[in-house]
């Protein structure tokens, strides 16, 4: 049978119009009616949420214990310094994290270009202002930069407070290199057909990635996610059968092993309680309803169970186990 996908038009014209080094408009046509909206919305979501980037995640400033401090000789308070640090655009080559050092003395502005960089780390916006130092002031800090995707608040990260040194301030991180994406759908025409669409993507990045390359990466991600649907036969995921947790061997022992009085043992067997696993699932109220089993016998049962680390009223999800018979 002929593949129905071949009956649809595919975009043949792709036009990239650079607005600046970090801003471009990418148009594609023709699309069947409705397909430009479908793909435009999908690409926009992927561009905003799934492009890898780099962001400061931890900061240590000499003489500062928390973000609500102030530094002598520095015009901005620590909160403003941290906000300005988030605006520094960095690109790491061949690594996923790095700790950078920033030291400066003397009056003047502290810029992103003042950060000491190894050979494989690049500052995209070196003129970005981090803070201003007054006469006699200085600043000494370490900044941890990590690779990630999307936006990650401090609470979403796996690092724990007890693993950090005193004075380390964690930052909410916006890793996405894509600052803004919008799309528009316009009318397109091919020969006599006028019911077609043109997709126009307007993309602005922070300079870590070119807009055109961001579109390519987003398209690859979308194709990879959809490829599983292209061949559904023989690709069914095996059902995972959860194994029942093992049963404590003591629960499989008969109640006779508890060495109860004859009266108590007979009362339990009359209620079809043959195993310790049967017994611990009964409550005190249920046992007191048993004929000829009084408070004295109940206390005896509780004491014997307690000596083995067990109590009445326990819940067993996989009881009785398969193949368990009356003793």
Curated annotation (Swiss-Prot):
Belongs to the RNA polymerase alpha chain family. NCBIfam families: PRK05182.1-2, PRK05182.2-5, rpoA. It catalyses: RNA(n) + a ribonucleoside 5'-triphosphate = RNA(n+1) + diphosphate. GO terms for cellular component: cytoplasm; DNA-directed RNA polymerase complex. The keyword DNA damage does not apply. Residues 247-327 are annotated as: Alpha C-terminal domain (alpha-CTD). Keywords: DNA-directed RNA polymerase, Nucleotidyltransferase, Transcription, Transferase. The N-terminal domain is essential for RNAP assembly and basal transcription, whereas the C-terminal domain is involved in interaction with transcriptional regulators and with upstream promoter elements. Residues 1-233 are annotated as: Alpha N-terminal domain (alpha-NTD). GO terms for molecular function: DNA binding; DNA-directed RNA polymerase activity; protein dimerization activity. Signal peptide: none annotated. InterPro entries: DNA-dir_RNA_pol_insert, DNA-dir_RNA_pol_RpoA/D/Rpb3, DNA-dir_RpoA, RBP11-like, RNAP_asu_C, RNApol_insert_sf. Transmembrane segments: none annotated. One of its GO terms (biological process) is DNA-templated transcription. It comes from the Bacteria. It is an enzyme of class 2 (transferase). DNA-dependent RNA polymerase catalyzes the transcription of DNA into RNA using the four ribonucleoside triphosphates as substrates. Homodimer. The RNAP catalytic core consists of 2 alpha, 1 beta, 1 beta' and 1 omega subunit. When a sigma factor is associated with the core the holoenzyme is formed, which can initiate transcription. It comes from Chromobacterium violaceum (strain ATCC 12472 / DSM 30191 / JCM 1249 / CCUG 213 / NBRC 12614 / NCIMB 9131 / NCTC 9757 / MK). Its EC number is 2.7.7.6. SUPFAM superfamilies: C-terminal domain of RNA polymerase alpha subunit, Insert subdomain of RNA polymerase alpha subunit, RBP11-like subunits of RNA polymerase. This is DNA-directed RNA polymerase subunit alpha.
């Amino acid at each position: 049978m002929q593949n129905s996908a071949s009956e649809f038009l595919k975009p043949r014209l792709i036009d990239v119009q650079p607005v600046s080094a970090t801003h471009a408009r990418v148009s594609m046509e023709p699309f069947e009616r409705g397909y430009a909206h479908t793909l435009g919305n999908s690409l926009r979501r992927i561009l905003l949420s799934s492009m890898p980037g780099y962001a400061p995640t931890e900061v240590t400033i000499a003489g500062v214990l928390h973000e609500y401090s102030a530094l002598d000789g520095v015009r901005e308070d620590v909160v403003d310094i941290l906000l300005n640090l988030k605006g520094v655009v960095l690109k790491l080559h061949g690594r996923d994290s790095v700790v950078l050092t920033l030291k400066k003395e003397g009056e003047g502005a502290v810029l992103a270009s003042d950060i000491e960089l190894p050979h494989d780390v690049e500052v995209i916006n070196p003129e970005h202002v981090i803070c201003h130092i007054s006469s006699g002031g200085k600043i000494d800090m370490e900044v941890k930069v990590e690779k990630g995707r999307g936006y990650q608040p401090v609470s979403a990260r796996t690092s724990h407070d007890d693993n950090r040194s005193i004075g380390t301030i964690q930052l909410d991180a916006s890793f996405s290199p894509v600052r803004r994406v919008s799309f528009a759908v316009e009318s397109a025409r091919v020969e006599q057909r006028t019911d077609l669409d043109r997709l126009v993507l307007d993309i602005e990045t922070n300079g870590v990635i070119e807009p055109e390359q961001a579109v390519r990466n987003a398209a690859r991600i979308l194709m990879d996610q959809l490829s599983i649907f292209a061949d559904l036969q023989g690709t069914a995921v095996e059902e995972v059968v959860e194994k029942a947790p093992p049963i404590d061997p003591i629960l499989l022992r008969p109640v006779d092993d508890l060495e109860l009085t004859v009266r108590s043992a007979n009362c339990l067997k009359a209620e079809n309680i043959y195993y310790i696993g049967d017994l611990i699932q009964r409550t005190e109220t249920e046992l007191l309803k048993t004929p000829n089993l009084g408070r004295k016998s109940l206390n005896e049962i509780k004491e014997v169970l307690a000596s083995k680390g067990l109590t009445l009223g326990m819940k067993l999800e996989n009881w009785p186990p398969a193949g368990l018979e009356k003793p």
